[in-house]
């Protein structure tokens, strides 16, 4: 099969590799649609200590497809089923799983290698995090389940409610999906970003109530507060960039009693500085949410299937496997939101 293999930072190759036969409980999926992702771009640029443990390695993790082969003992699926699979599944036995904190599982079974014609899905993911698609749902839309599951997890854990003012800095795919989910939950949403392609998507896809161009207004705190009820500050402020200075900036935008959600992960070892008086006496809730769980993976599929989230509007272009490196470069240059990768041309 054709597969994009990661060799080292900024060195990936589309080449022929063997299809891994399915072991007990596993399935081989013929990939019909895959998507580029910010994590993949970071991996392309500097590698990844978890996803890429040895090289060469498969690459990519957002996909949908058709079951091509079944391993021994697989139940609930058959060859020909149209499916979407997550890129992980919790063990259900470790300390965190016993506390129902499945996203923090110490033994997450991770899956990488979606930029390929076939992928072999581990047994635990087959059992816990692989879903059959509704007949009306396209492969292209279904491939968005994994990134949307992260956002739905974050939005529900944040407790976004109808009528609240929600502000988001950072409007890549995750920030845009956060804005759209917040709108579905009934919030009033203001977003801030720099990229003209993504600013347009904030209107066309997310349907944000107000959009700030940070090139024109680099310090959006005043605009965020003016957007809020009585100018007190946002009910919910969400950071989707992953820079310490933006963490500090978004903290300044929330009201007393509000919630700050730091969703964008900063570089390891980063430090931030907050006014502890404002945090303590303002009764401000500060939180972060990582990854997704089987529950939110299912919620993501439901949202996409319902048509409430028009994920296809986030696709910048459709490319073959041979153009994945080009896609990475386009992302680095800020010329795309997401690329749809079609392994079969």
Where does each model-flagged region fall?
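Glycine-rich beta-strand-centered segment in the early N-terminal region that forms part
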Residues: 20-34, 48-95, 132-136
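Adenosine-nucleotide cofactor-binding segment
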Residues: 168, 183-249
């Amino acid at each position: 099969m054709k597969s994009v293999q990661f060799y080292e930072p900024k060195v990936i190759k589309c080449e022929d590799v063997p299809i891994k036969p399915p072991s007990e409980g596993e399935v081989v999926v013929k990939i019909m649609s895959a998507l580029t992702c910010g994590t993949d771009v970071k991996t392309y640029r500097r590698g990844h200590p978890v996803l890429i443990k040895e090289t060469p390695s498969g690459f990519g993790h957002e996909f949908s497809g058709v079951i091509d082969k079944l391993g021994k003992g697989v139940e609930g699926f058959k060859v020909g089923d149209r499916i979407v699979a997550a890129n992980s599944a919790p063990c259900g036995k470790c300390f965190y799983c016993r506390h129902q904190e499945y996203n923090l599982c110490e033994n997450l079974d991770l899956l990488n290698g979606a930029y390929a014609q076939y992928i072999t899905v581990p047994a635990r993911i087959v059992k816990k995090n692989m879903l059959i698609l509704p007949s009306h749902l396209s492969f292209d839309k279904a491939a968005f389940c994994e990134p949307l599951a992260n956002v739905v997890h974050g939005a529900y854990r944040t407790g976004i409610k109808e009528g609240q003012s929600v502000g988001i800095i950072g409007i890549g795919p995750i920030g845009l999906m956060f804005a759209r989910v917040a709108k579905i939950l009934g919030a009033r949403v203001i977003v801030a970003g720099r990229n003209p392609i993504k600013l347009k998507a904030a209107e066309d896809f997310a349907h944000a109530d107000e959009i700030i161009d940070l090139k024109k207004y680099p310090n959006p705190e005043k605009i965020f507060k003016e957007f809020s009820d009585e100018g007190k500050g946002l009910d919910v402020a969400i950071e989707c960039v992953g820079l310490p200075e933006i963490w500090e900036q978004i903290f300044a935008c929330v009201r007393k009693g509000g919630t700050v959600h730091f969703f964008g992960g900063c570089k390891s070892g980063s430090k931030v500085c907050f006014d502890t008086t404002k945090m303590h006496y303002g009764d401000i809730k500060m939180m972060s949410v990582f990854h997704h769980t089987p529950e939110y993976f299912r919620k993501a599929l439901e949202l996409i299937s319902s048509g409430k989230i028009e994920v296809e509007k986030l696709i910048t272009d459709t490319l073959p496997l041979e153009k994945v490196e080009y896609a990475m470069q386009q992302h680095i240059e800020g010329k795309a939101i997401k690329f749809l990768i079609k392994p079969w041309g």
